[in-house]
Every structure is written in structure tokens, then in C-alpha cells.
Amino acid sequence: MTSQAMKIQTALAIALLTAASLVLAGCSGVDSTTTVTTPVTVSGMVLNGTVHGGQQPINGATMQLYAAGSTGYGSAYTYTSGTSLLGTHVVKTDINGGFNITGDYTCPTPTTEVYLVATGGYPGPTAPVNNNIALMAALGPCGLLSGSTNVNINEITTVASVWALSPFMTGIANIGTSSTNAQGLTNAFATVNELVNIGTGSVSGPALPVGATLSAATVAKINTLADLLAACINSSGGVAGDGSGCGLLFTAAKVSGVAPTDTITAALNMAQHPSANTSVATTVSGGAPFQPALTSAPSDFSLVITYTGGGISAPKGIATDSTGNVWVANSGGSSVTKLDALGVTTTDTTGYLSGTNGYNVGSLNAPVALAIDLSGNAWVANGNSTVTEIAANGLTGTLFNGGSMSSPSSVAIDASSNVWIANSGNGSITEITPGTTPAYNNYNGFGVAAPSAIAINPK
């Protein structure tokens, strides 16, 4: 990580940009179902689009519109008639890969996150049916879909959607979050539009903020992953180990010895195990449809978005608040930067410093760590053995310098809003009880020596 940029792996970024923490691993979530028999009446709009394998239209692919669940990670939203919002309606692509969904669905709620999936079909005018085909595009809140919504589903939209949603995903029809982390799922769907333009099926997305970039290496990874999917999709299919395009992909995407049988599941396995079998990248030919591609095997298939601006300078600490905003402690600029869930530097209604050089209130001094309390205030450990509390809006700051703090290295906040600081300089722990007259306690002994981190046991 350079002193002027913050790089966040997409899979990790989704966790960091959520109201929850790093436990958002789709492979370890609860696979359950949210069943609704009487959906909220939000009329479905016409959806138009095309499905392509590489540059080749897919004819006869079956379209499904799915909604994300809310009863656990990897949960599915289900009507009594099935998991798809289209119910018994059958929508297939035509010879040009085109599809038209003419309002044959009802949004569960206006804010329910939805996504389109295309499976099967003929990947060319004379090609046989390929049942290994599975492509997708994350659309976002159901209520925002309109008659002008046009979707170009291909391998690029599939890679972007799967990688962004992988912490919440266990299968094609299983994307969901817990009842306490709806914001996290919202942020993940929004991240898709930073990676890809769903309307054109190309990198990068319209939501990529000013100052944020996809590196050449990340673009090459996306293209390579898309090419691996295309080698399977633009074929008659196959199984792991048969040497075909599908066979190579499914072999590389095995998890615990079990090979996938469709391209979305293969992509999901690779997203959730990004360091496994990366040598498959070398099987992509120079004539593959998505270029530029990788020329050698990467160390992993993680996707990185680089965020700059807002005063980011030698960042040392990062934390998220309850609405998904990311707070960054800038040791190089003695400031704190606040980014929204898409990485956009925030500017308060008063035009405060966050959009330029970051917040610098409360005598910030080479901050090294920070934590957010239940009210959204940021508590920042400074390099000069003090702690600064920054109000949630960034407009005011309060300096705390008691409790024998010495080179604080980490901050944590308990359920009673007490602030705990690990002091690496004198081998102690400081507790601050905020208030009009703050109270300080210092604890040493118990084998504490130069502590570098601190956490609270919620029990």
C-alpha cells in the first residue's frame, strides 16, 4: 500500500464497506430461505437485454430474476411458486441473444436487491445446447428498475457480480444477508457497478468514483476470468478432467475435491478461494474475446479497487460506521478521511474538509488507529500519545490525553461506550469513560507488553 493510495481487495472491501465486519464470508454463511406468500405490490417493469458468450449471442437461454434473501448469508428469497420472481413465466433469449421481460414479476419490496441469471442455450447458430452455461448480472434495488433498464449479460458482468457478491453467496439462487446487515448487501450490489457497466457489459462501471481506479492488473484479471468462462460457454460443454474449456475451468474451480458443473458456480468457487489453482490463467489463448488478459499466472484472483483523494496519506487505520462509511486514519497528513460505501470522499453540507484534505479537528497528530462508537463518532489514536474523538459529522473534535497513554497502537469500544486503548509505549491499557468530565483508568501487568492490538469480548 503506497502512502497516497488505499488498495482494498474487492472481496475484503465488501466486508470493510459494510455495517458488519470481516465475517462476511459467503462460504461460511447460513443457507436458508425467506418465504413470502403475499409480496408487496410493486409492479414489475419491462426489462430488456442481451446475453452473450464472448461476442457470440446465446440463443435459447432461460432467464430468471432472483431476489436476495434476508435470513442469513447465502439465503434465498422464495415465493411459494419457486425461487425466481418470474414464477411459472418462461422467458428465453432469441437468436440474437435478446430477451424481454414484460412485467412478469412483482418486487418483494422496492429496496429488495435483485439479479438476472441466464442458463443453458445455444452459444452459436450451429452450436449444440450447452447446459454448463450460467451467466448473471446484479441489478440492484428492484424498485429502481425501469422501462429503460437495458442489461448486457456476459462473462464480464458475471465476474463482477460474483466477485462483489461472493461474501453473501452460496449458489445461483442463493444470495442473501442476515437481518442485521442489509446495508452490507446493498453496498455489495453497488460495488458491482464500480467494476462493470451492466448496460454495456464492459469494464469499468459508471459508479466508479472520481479518484478511484481499477489497475491494469485488475482489468487483466477480470478479462482473464471472463475468458476462462467464455472458453466453456462458447463450446458444447464438458466435465472436469476432459480437457475441454469447461473441463479446464471446472478442474481449476474444484473445492474439497468437488467440481462445479456450471460457470457461475465455477466463478463463485474461484472468488471464494482466490489463491487456488491460479495457473489456469495460462490456458487463456491470445485470441480470447476479452483483452488485455494476464500473460502469466497471478498470485491470486483477488480484484482490487484503488481509492485516492480526500487527504489519504500513509493510511494506518481503517474502520466502518453503521451506514457503511469508511474512516481512514492518515498518519502522513495528521487527518482522517471519510469515504462513503462506494469510496466517494464525503463533504458535509457545510463543505468541510473531508472532500479535500480530510478532517483535521481535535488536534490530530499522525493518527495510527481508529474505532467508531455507537453514535457514529470516530475515536482516533494519535502518534503523540493522545486520543481524539471526532463527531460523526466531522465538524468538531475533542482531545483526550490522560490515563498514562503512551504510543497508542489500537482502539476498541465496548457496549457501554467506554474506549479502550492499547499502549505499545509502556505496556499498558487505558480505559476512557467519556462524559463532561471524562474518567481514565490505566491497567498494566497481566503479561501485557508493547500491545499492538485490542479487541472487546462481547460476552
Residue ranges and their predicted role:
Residues 2-3, 85-87, 92, 329, ...:
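First exposed extracellular module after export/assembly in secreted or surface-exposed proteins
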Residues 13-21:
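Hydrophobic helical h-region of N-terminal Sec-dependent signal peptides
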Residues 2-14:
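Bacterial N-terminal signal peptides that target proteins for export
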Residues 31-144:
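Beta-strand-dominated extracellular/periplasmic modules and repeats
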Residues 23-26:
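C-terminal motif of bacterial Sec signal peptides marking the signal peptidase cleavage site
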Residues 106-305:
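Mature extracellular/secreted ectodomains of secretory-pathway proteins
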Residues 282-459:
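Flexible "stalk/tail and boundary" regions
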Residues 64-70, 119, 232-235, 339, ...:
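Predominantly extracellular/luminal cell-surface or secreted proteins
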